[in-house]
Structures are given as C-alpha cells and as structure tokens.
Amino acid sequence: SCNTATCVTHRLAGLLSRSGGVVKSNFVPTNVGSQAF
C-alpha cells in the first residue's frame, strides 16, 4: 500500500525506533531525507 521511497523510509524508521532504538543511532531519517530526497 506504500510505494513511495519517502513513505517506506518513514515507515521503516518508525518500525526500527519502536522495535529497539539500536539502529536509531546509526540511521538518522533527517540526514537520509535531506541527502536522498
């Protein structure tokens, strides 16, 4: 249901942050968003 890259990225970021927060330190949505999009 979610095909756009931004939507998928935000969904993955939300799942990862809820699941543990370990990846959160290595994956910063704002930096990735500004560079990739």
Swiss-Prot record:
Origin organism of this chain? Ovis aries
Q: What's any one GO cellular component for it?
A: extracellular space
Q: Where in the cell is it found?
A: Secreted
Role description: CGRP1/CALCA is a peptide hormone that induces vasodilation mediated by the CALCRL-RAMP1 receptor complex. Dilates a variety of vessels including the coronary, cerebral and systemic vasculature. Its abundance in the CNS also points toward a neurotransmitter or neuromodulator role. It also elevates platelet cAMP. CGRP1 can also bind and activate CALCR-RAMP1 (AMYR1) receptor complex.
Q: Which UniProt keywords apply?
A: Amidation, Disulfide bond, Hormone, Secreted
Protein name in UniProt: Calcitonin gene-related peptide 1
Q: Which residues carry this modification: Phenylalanine amide?
A: 37
| UniProt-recorded Gene Ontology molecular function terms | calcitonin receptor binding; hormone activity
Q: Which pairs of positions does the record mark as disulfide bonds?
A: 2-7
Family, similarity comment: Belongs to the calcitonin family.
Q: Which InterPro entries match?
A: Calcitonin-like, Calcitonin/adrenomedullin, Calcitonin_CS, Calcitonin_gene-rel_peptide, Calcitonin_peptide-like
BP GO terms, sorted? adenylate cyclase-activating G protein-coupled receptor signaling pathway; regulation of cytosolic calcium ion concentration
The principal location of this protein is secreted
